[in-house]
Swiss-Prot record:
CDD domains associated with the record: ZnF_GATA
Classification lineage: Eukaryota, Metazoa, Chordata, Craniata, Vertebrata
GO molecular function: chromatin binding; DNA-binding transcription factor activity; DNA-binding transcription factor activity, RNA polymerase II-specific; DNA-binding transcription factor binding; NFAT protein binding; protein kinase binding; RNA polymerase II cis-regulatory region sequence-specific DNA binding; sequence-specific double-stranded DNA binding
PANTHER family recorded: TRANSCRIPTION FACTOR GATA FAMILY MEMBER, TRANSCRIPTION FACTOR GATA-6
Effect of residue 466 to H: In CTHM; persistent truncus arteriosus; loss of transcriptional activity
Oligomeric and partner information: Interacts with LMCD1.
Disordered: annotated segments: 14-71, 208-255, 286-339, 482-561
Identification of the protein by name: Transcription factor GATA-6
Modified residues (Phosphoserine): 268
Zn finger spans (GATA-type): 390-414, 444-468
Effect annotated for changing residue 469 to V: Found in patients with atrial fibrillation; likely pathogenic; significant loss of transcriptional activator activity
Superkingdom of source: Eukaryota
Domain notes: The GATA-type zinc fingers mediate interaction with LMCD1.
Amino acid sequence: MALTDGGWCLPKRFGAAGADASDSRAFPAREPSTPPSPISSSSSSCSRGGERGPGGASNCGTPQLDTEAAAGPPARSLLLSSYASHPFGAPHGPSAPGVAGPGGNLSSWEDLLLFTDLDQAATASKLLWSSRGAKLSPFAPEQPEEMYQTLAALSSQGPAAYDGAPGGFVHSAAAAAAAAAAASSPVYVPTTRVGSMLPGLPYHLQGSGSGPANHAGGAGAHPGWPQASADSPPYGSGGGAAGGGAAGPGGAGSAAAHVSARFPYSPSPPMANGAAREPGGYAAAGSGGAGGVSGGGSSLAAMGGREPQYSSLSAARPLNGTYHHHHHHHHHHPSPYSPYVGAPLTPAWPAGPFETPVLHSLQSRAGAPLPVPRGPSADLLEDLSESRECVNCGSIQTPLWRRDGTGHYLCNACGLYSKMNGLSRPLIKPQKRVPSSRRLGLSCANCHTTTTTLWRRNAEGEPVCNACGLYMKLHGVPRPLAMKKEGIQTRKRKPKNINKSKTCSGNSNNSIPMTPTSTSSNSDDCSKNTSPTTQPTASGAGAPVMTGAGESTNPENSELKYSGQDGLYIGVSLASPAEVTSSVRPDSWCALALA
């Protein structure tokens, strides 16, 4: 946005109260070629205790320029006072070197130079005037030529990333001043142009040179890359722009000493000149903050027509002062890894995909050799166990590979055999023992047979067959040759689970042959079974009839009937115990003999 002289006239906003400001100071005269010292630039700040105007802003007097300074272009009309005032109270700015008073806002000569470059850059087709600023800056070292011209060209052609220009996450000073003049509060204009900003490049590397007055050394070296100079900031703007973007008011007075806050966690140690890094990631060096809540703290971000593309990023930030560093701007953190936010509040804007320590650690390890992937390792060779072969048996598959004393591989079986026996495992399995009956050249010393189920030895130790050995063992004499048999007599063993035969009892249903002594001695006892009425009943019940083997004078008395229907013992023809035992024993013997 092209800014005119009238746009810089904050006395219009302040009214007549600016003329009555008691703490206004005139800018000292300077030589055209040599910039004033940072101490002399302290006149660019307003006292913290300045009078409050109707709009709630601190009133400061207008600057007085000498003839040489006034003879410059019309854009040389400098903005006096805090170019934006804190809408909620006194500015919270650090007393940086080169700033008079604890609340001073203009920090160094680069701040004034940045103001003067705004309209010139806008009217001169947005060219980079930072090279002139580098020559005028007393702290800017000599910068090498642009190393990455392609990135610089891309960044100079297209819109810059939101941290490329000095305005980091904050509005430009012109926008902050215009917003403060309009409504005493920041107004955000979101836009969709941010998505089109060089998507192929990380925003750390995108054009910090696209802004007209991004940094004082922008033409000489791209600020996104580390400089080769030993005393230059590792990620800084080459000493041109004060860190935090465009030498935020209240920042460190030295432009080169103030490291660019776009890289708040630089892995490099503090620089030799002893300048500490600002605590804030994106709102450092500003007395207000990234949210644009305090206009005076909005870094100058001289965008020259590029205000809208940064406003959307600023609008995405919360307005709760998350990025404000009210209490921590007064200290400088000596640690090279300063946090995003100095205040104890948590940043609501998460780290971007490129804001990882990996990006910076890769740059810091540029000289260190990268770890090279190992070639075929021992683990890989261990996996190729298919190529192994047992040196003893030739096996290629085994649950566990072992080694012998010479380091050769053995299968598990051969290795265990060698370990236990101290010998190599025999390759041919031993044949099963030949049956003793088939042993070659072996014959019985007694009967001269060659077949036997078991070979024995006699008292002299000579082998004998099983038959001769048992005979000698049992009888004490040699087995006679007449007993020799061609075949082997084997015992026909019966099954062990033989159903025991039922004994001769009243419950037995088997017909038992009776002895002759049990004929008619008890015919009177069995008279009840001989009646014509009970015999058919007993026979009809299916009870077996036991016939005696001997003679009987009465045919009816020769039969014993048992009633099986009720299982009761009806009668028996055996009276004496001797006869009972004589009847039971033959039955027991028959059961064992005939079974």
